[in-house]
A protein has these predicted regions:
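Charged, amphipathic alpha-helical linker segments immediately N-terminal to NTP-binding catalytic cores
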Residues: 1-27
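ATP-dependent carboxylate-amine ligase catalytic core
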Residues: 13-16, 27-29, 33-48, 74-160, ...
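Nucleotide phosphate-binding/pyrophosphate-handling subdomain across enzymes
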Residues: 51, 138, 143-146, 155-166, ...
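A conserved segment at the C-terminal end of the G1
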Residues: 55, 63-80
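Beta-strand->loop->alpha-helix junctions that form or flank phosphate-binding loops
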Residues: 82, 201-203, 215-234, 255-258, ...
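Acidic, Mg2+-coordinating active-site environments of NTP-dependent enzymes
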Residues: 120, 142-147, 162-250, 265-287
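C-terminal helical cap/extension that packs against the catalytic core
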Residues: 200, 204-209, 213-222, 233, ...
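Short, flexible loop segments at boundaries between secondary-structure elements
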Residues: 366-370, 431-437
Length: 437
């Protein structure tokens, strides 16, 4: 509802707001903090309305945020979460108390931004970031979790000073924006660090420039492998966390599937411990949160026999992680891959760790301008396992299902759009709710 005397909002439904935002700014991606920071100040959104943990990294961002969200909710805190991109609905990007924000509050937030921006142009992502911060302030969140959209140093979420900054991993992706190697990319991701404010790096091989940037700011940096780590898994699935001068023994298996998730959980625990002076936690909340975390599209099982898994892996590092999951969990039958990918990705680098693990490939088209045509993707698979091309990702998945036998598994991957296409198609799992934490 508009404030008394306020001008009528530009639009009264979410779809119109989002369509307009996609066309409004001169560039779809426009990294930089000046414009969005000025509007944030005009709206009174700085400093932050609650303690902030900002999470960046090439892979593992969403999972680490999901663990943190579940831990803080288990402790009884009011948690505001901002992530991107979304899978099915824009509303997924902003969560209040574990639930996607409704259309009405989003429209109110966009109207407030539009009134305040004083002719300053904003990108689609900048509108979303400001909407999240406005809603977190209005709803009086106890803790705010922000996922970096792209890079870190010039990403819109970096208009707020993080009380704890997290870089989960550093791999090669988005080179045209962030640089061609891990050193350049690591520096961009370290841009969320603040002087004398704690930070966490979950990468076991942190780039030198990331370490140097932390040192130049006097940022206390907790490093995976030396300052904290996840212990091995016992036969009953439990594991130990070691770090920050303490040990948490017999932690439950993480609520997210895949061996990599213990490392993401350990990174989240470390970040939460570093914020304990402002947001105290109990060991019980940590245990419950680790077990209860959920996140759609991250090595998520949709059905059994044949097993259907979806994973948003879309860069070489993500593909290596996915390949590790598949190798760790061999099946009696075949592994069938349903894939579509964006044209600007390192396709050979994505395929390399998976070639030997896949017995048949099913490629489909995506109705996305950036998508690589399946015929072009097939060229990269010449000499590999058999390849089928279908008119859409959903039809590619249907073909894989029809040709799968008991004991086979199907893995759908390559981008958020690929996973979304399968989640919203009329398969048996289509009505299953999307879960975050």
């Amino acid at each position: 509802m508009s404030e008394p005397g306020a001008p009528r909002p530009r639009f009264d439904n979410l779809s119109d707001w989002l369509d307009w935002q996609e066309r409004f700014h001169i560039r779809p991606i426009d990294l930089g903090l000046e414009r969005v920071g000025r509007v944030a100040d005009l709206m009174g959104l700085r400093p932050a309305s609650a303690p902030v943990i900002t999470v960046g990294g090439t892979n593992g961002k969403g999972s680490t945020v999901a663990f943190l969200e579940a831990i803080y909710r288990a402790a009884g805190y009011r948690v505001g979460v901002y992530t991107s991109p979304h899978l099915l609905r824009y509303n997924e990007r902003i969560r209040l108390q574990g639930e996607p924000v409704g259309d009405g509050p989003l429209c109110e937030a966009f109207a407030a931004i539009d009134r305040a921006r004083d002719n300053i142009s904003l990108s689609y992502f900048e509108f979303g970031t400001l909407a999240a911060l406005w809603l977190f302030r209005r709803e009086s969140m106890d803790v705010i979790l922000l996922e970096v959209g792209l890079g870190g140093r010039l990403d819109a979420v970096n208009i707020l000073d993080a009380h704890v900054a997290v870089v989960t991993s550093v791999g090669i992706d988005h080179q045209s924006w962030l640089g061609e190697d891990r050193e350049a990319i690591g520096f961009e991701k370290a841009g969320i660090f603040r002087g004398e404010q704690p930070a966490v790096c979950g990468d076991m091989d942190p780039p030198r420039r990331l370490l140097e940037h932390a040192a130049s700011l006097d940022t206390p940096l907790a490093l995976a492998g030396s300052d904290f780590h996840a212990g091995p898994v016992a036969e009953n699935g439990v594991w130990d966390y070691h770090g920050m001068g303490m040990t948490l023994t017999a932690l439950p298996p993480p609520g997210l599937a895949g061996s990599v998730q213990r490392g993401n959980a350990a990174t989240a625990i470390t970040a939460a411990l570093l914020l304990e002076d402002q947001v105290p936690l109990t060991e019980r909340a940590v245990r419950e949160g680790i077990a209860q975390a959920r996140l759609a599209g991250r090595y998520q099982c949709l059905q059994q026999d044949p097993a259907v898994w979806v994973d948003v892996a879309h860069n070489p590092q993500g593909a290596r992680i996915l390949g590790g999951h598949l190798a760790d969990e061999p099946v009696k039958g075949r592994t069938l891959a349903v894939m579509a990918v964006m044209a600007d990705k390192d396709v050979p680098g994505i395929l390399e760790p998976l070639r030997s693990l896949v017995d048949a490939w099913y490629l489909g088209a995506l109705d996305v301008p950036r998508a690589l045509a399946p015929e072009e993707l097939a060229v990269h698979l010449e000499g590999a396992a058999p390849v089928q091309i279908q008119a859409s990702v959903a039809e590619a998945c249907e073909a894989a299902l029809l040709q799968a036998s008991p004991g086979d598994r199907i893995i759908v991957f390559g981008s958020f759009h690929t996973v979304a296409a399968v989640l919203q198609a009329p398969f048996p799992w289509a009505d299953a709710p999307l879960k975050s934490a």
